[in-house]
Amino acid sequence: MKTPLRYPGGKSRAVKHILPFIPEGVERVCSPFFGGGSVELALASRGVQVFGYDKMKQLVWFWQGVCGDNNRLADEVEKLQEQYVIRSKKTVKGCSKKSFHQYRKDLMTESFMFSYERAAKYYAINRASFSGATFSGGWSERASYAR
């Protein structure tokens, strides 16, 4: 499985070079800086039990959604897209610049508790920002509508 996130410093292109250095027979991996999780997902697909942690709460919420009920998370992402289509009366799916800034504001000011809606908002801004730089990067029209 490939990571669904774009993540600064991500290892998606390096996975094939990193995995040979993981000894055979490893049963568990603890990742204190999970981020986009490329290496960890590759290990999990081999049956390795992965414990992932990260300081960024919003990123953790996203992964909680994926590991909890990924169908519900997908439904929440779809709901965000449908709300945009209804509000803007446009048929294109993506994350508008206005929505991008609103979602970022929501994630920085709302309660710091997990919800599938917050996890979906994190995913939306990750996919719509330059190189996945969610809170430090800006909105990218190309990134937003290309995914």
What feature does the model see in each segment?
Residues 46-147:
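Class I S-adenosyl-L-methionine-dependent methyltransferase module
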Residues 1-34, 38-39, 43-45:
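S-adenosyl-L-methionine
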